[in-house]
Amino acid sequence: MNFAVLPPEVNSARIFAGAGLGPMLAAASAWDGLAEELHAAAGSFASVTTGLTGDAWHGPASLAMTRAASPYVGWLNTAAGQAAQAAGQARLAASAFEATLAATVSPAMVAANRTRLASLVAANLLGQNAPAIAAAEAEYEQIWAQDVAAMFGYHSAASAVATQLAPIQEGLQQQLQNVLAQLASGNLGSGNVGVGNIGNDNIGNANIGFGNRGDANIGIGNIGDRNLGIGNTGNWNIGIGITGNGQIGFGKPANPDVLVVGNGGPGVTALVMGGTDSLLPLPNIPLLEYAARFITPVHPGYTATFLETPSQFFPFTGLNSLTYDVSVAQGVTNLHTAIMAQLAAGNEVVVFGTSQSATIATFEMRYLQSLPAHLRPGLDELSFTLTGNPNRPDGGILTRFGFSIPQLGFTLSGATPADAYPTVDYAFQYDGVNDFPKYPLNVFATANAIAGILFLHSGLIALPPDLASGVVQPVSSPDVLTTYILLPSQDLPLLVPLRAIPLLGNPLADLIQPDLRVLVELGYDRTAHQDVPSPFGLFPDVDWAEVAADLQQGAVQGVNDALSGLGLPPPWQPALPRLF
């Protein structure tokens, strides 16, 4: 499923530049020919055998030969039928390819969109082309979604074709050898290893049932010795799911990857994914508890479970790690499979994604949007909670800058859909991954955002989220399904190294922070609609008189804060409120 993170330039080019229908139709024709030859061979073999036994060859030897030959005639007929089925499946694959080709956007249309975007960006000196750039990006996202939907459809159709192909029948001689081996070891059934087993796939001795591991177990999936029941682990247990020894009843093995919140739902499951390089050794309770702080305000009761994703980004997570694109693609596969499994079980699903897994959630939203309405989950069945989202429409670093690094396997992924499913998107102020400045020429804002990535996003400074102080940010329409919340940062990440200096570090940082915050905030537009993708601009519209007044107020506040930090009374009472 790598195509889920590949841009339309790649997906469209691949489907249009491929070999086409020819090889698949040729394969279908070849399988048809093989089926005809096998049918003819079976008929000829049966005819010769019948002729011999019906004319000159009679007696016990003739009867024995007839009995020996009959299974081979059946094998030839079965193989002929399987070859004919393979021919039909090849034609189905060709039809699926033809439908995919028709549904995929042509490379010429993709190139036209990219050319138009490049022209708009080049001429966007004063930001006047921002609406047109956003429209071009929106069109590009639609093209991306259409290509991904076509490729997912092709993947599903091709997978269905492949799974319907039956393996070639095992030879009669091998079947006979398997039966003789089972009888010689005193086993009755198939796949047993040991002596005296009755059933299938038992490993040990004197087991009765299926999939037991040990000795003298009766039941299904028991591990240990002399258990009676299903799924017991230990010895001498009678019941279901017991862990221990000599117990009777029902048990539930402890699951270190599950956290029950509130009343546990019921029927509400939270799938919790970590960020880049967060594939921690189990258990993952700290991650589940962290996610619970953000999920619980909307869902007071649910059962949270850790969903494993690769969480890798070559070369930052190691020279042997997966590239970002491959890691995200595998994560999308894991997430989609888990969502469908929970929905099939009748559960409502909440997806929690942070950092890289927020990008995984973005791709899953897009894929679900591309499906017909009757095939995708309802708005009351699925919701998302995101933090540290690099695809946030206004502020996400992957949305601010439309760049890809093919050498590192890193492809632009665009903005998270705002109208796919009910979503709460939390952004930490000054974390450059989800709150990157709109005007990066502001060196104070950009340096502070980079420091935010280093100190806040990486977790080097563990700050508990203060959800009560979160600011709900504006959106373009009340019908938008996503709620955007900004969690304020009391201190600027850029001043973290200064605060590390003993004794004088904090007072000096407190002295300059209010004025520095004024300069940093000039790099942001806090009034922008958060659901509208916002690429970077060059120069903000600034009221310099207001900036001068804010700097004057900040200077007073800085002196008050510095003296307060030293335990001295401030010269101006009362202290002015902090700037946001």
From Swiss-Prot:
Q: Which residues does the UniProt record annotate as the domain PE-PPE?
A: 300-525
Q: Please give the biological process terms from Gene Ontology that the record holds.
A: response to host immune response
Xref: Pfam families: PE-PPE (PF08237), PPE (PF00823)
Q: Which InterPro entries does the UniProt record give? A: AB_hydrolase_fold, PE-PPE_C, PPE_dom, PPE_sf
Q: Which residues cross the membrane?
A: none
Q: Give the record's family classification.
A: Belongs to the mycobacterial PPE family.
Official protein name in the record = Uncharacterized PPE family protein PPE42
